[in-house]
Amino acid sequence: MQVSVETTSNIERRMTIGVPAQEIDQAVQKRLQETARTVRLNGFRPGKVPMSVVKRRFGDSIRQEVVGEAMRDNYIKALQEQDINPAGWPKLEPKTMEEGKDLEFVATFEVLPEIELGDLSKINVEKPVSEVADKDIDNMIDNLRRQQATMKEVKRKSKNKDIVTIDFKGSIDGEEFEGGSAEGHRLTLGSGQMIPGFEKGIVGGKAGEELEIDVTFPEDYHNEDLAGKDAKFAITIHKVEEPQLPELDQEFFKRFGIEAEDEVAFREEVKKNMERELKQAVSNKVKNDVVDGLLETTELEVPAALVDQEIDRLRQDAVQRFGGQVDFQQLPKEIFEEQAKRRVKTGLLFQEVVKKNDLKADEAKVEEKIQEIASTYEQPDEVVAHFNSNPDQKAQVESSVLEDAVVDFVLGAAKVKEKKMKYEEAVQAGQPQR
């Protein structure tokens, strides 16, 4: 086997491989003989078909099969000989494949980029500093109660947090516009679901009343045809309902999987959950800043093959989240391209930090993270046992711990600035980037 490698770009290689004609022709002949023993053709007894007939009928297709297998096998051997690590599968193109001639083919493929990490000291990280205050717990419990609320129709004037059932019809300069009308729409007043001024204009209205309100679409409204324009809405209120909040009793606590004797114990459990959420949010915010910093300080060309693989994973995840009712390949690749590129770049950069600094997943931290995950379940011991008896599951935790080690390493060199935030602000800042 003869091999030559040409560098066509930073991450693309063109490999020309030659395979002796004797090797290909022998494989073709062997396949023809096997076919002659098993093929059934009209006018011939099984196993008695002349080789000339078999070759005339099946020779071309058999040679194509043999050449395809030879290209795959010799490509893999060539990679090992040349000590090349490809990113994704190659494009294989035969140049010569005639009988009696050496097989020559070209494999075009991408390789993982050589990465020169940027100056980590130029990375800026903003770390939220926050705590769970009593007011935050009050708000959380109020939200939990509203999730479990039953609705009661009332005849009074509507107010914030009521749910109104309305018909509305919008117009601009006297002309109705697409998407500006609905019937039987249920709206929680004060939720911010509608454009500014819409919900406020309904507050104080009663069932059976007809209202007319003037609003202005925000300048950054997603529909450019409506952005910044004044509109008029004619609204009919059909029903006003107020939420009936459940009592804070043991039955209510159990709906959230919490065994608590009284409200004090329930608040303590809610606080623990909120503190866990806050801790994760801070970790996410710091990690997002680290990733942003690595991407900004390091030039990196990513192999298209890896991006395509990640796009397919994202499309499959999206299909699963929405019930698996469609083939993931029906989802446009463009929707996921930027997200896929970020993920691939992040993975390559993290791998480089690990390799250059010989970072490891600390076993004690792996066990600590497993215990932390298990503590959120009713049977934590069973969850721990599950992780310890399932190598793939444990490997995911080890990967997460190794990512944390990368973040910690970068933080040691980066400029870290702490910023005081309220609980809700910190949680919002720590929303993970997909």
Swiss-Prot record:
Q: Classify the main location.
A: cytoplasm
Q: What is its EC number?
A: 5.2.1.8
GO cellular component annotations of the record: cytoplasm
According to its UniProt record, which reaction does this protein catalyse? [protein]-peptidylproline (omega=180) = [protein]-peptidylproline (omega=0)
Instruction: Recall the GO molecular function terms of this protein's record.
Output: peptidyl-prolyl cis-trans isomerase activity; protein folding chaperone; ribosome binding
Residue ranges constituting the PPIase FKBP-type domain according to the UniProt record? 161-246
Keywords, A to Z, come to:
Cell cycle, Cell division, Chaperone, Cytoplasm, Isomerase, Rotamase
Q: Which domain of life is it from?
A: Bacteria
GO BP annotations listed = 'de novo' cotranslational protein folding; cell division; chaperone-mediated protein folding; protein transport; protein unfolding
The cellular location(s) given in this protein's UniProt record come to: Cytoplasm
Q: One of this protein's Pfam families, by short name?
A: Trigger_N
Under the heading Gene3D superfamilies, the entry gives: 3.10.50.40, Trigger factor ribosome-binding domain, Trigger factor, C-terminal domain
What is stated as this protein's family in its record?
Belongs to the FKBP-type PPIase family. Tig subfamily.
Which comment does the entry carry about domains? Consists of 3 domains; the N-terminus binds the ribosome, the middle domain has PPIase activity, while the C-terminus has intrinsic chaperone activity on its own.
The task this protein performs is described as: Involved in protein export. Acts as a chaperone by maintaining the newly synthesized protein in an open conformation. Functions as a peptidyl-prolyl cis-trans isomerase.
The identity of this protein, by name, is Trigger factor
Q: What is the scientific name of the source organism? A: Marinobacter nauticus (strain ATCC 700491 / DSM 11845 / VT8)
Lineage of producing organism: Bacteria, Pseudomonadati, Pseudomonadota, Gammaproteobacteria, Pseudomonadales
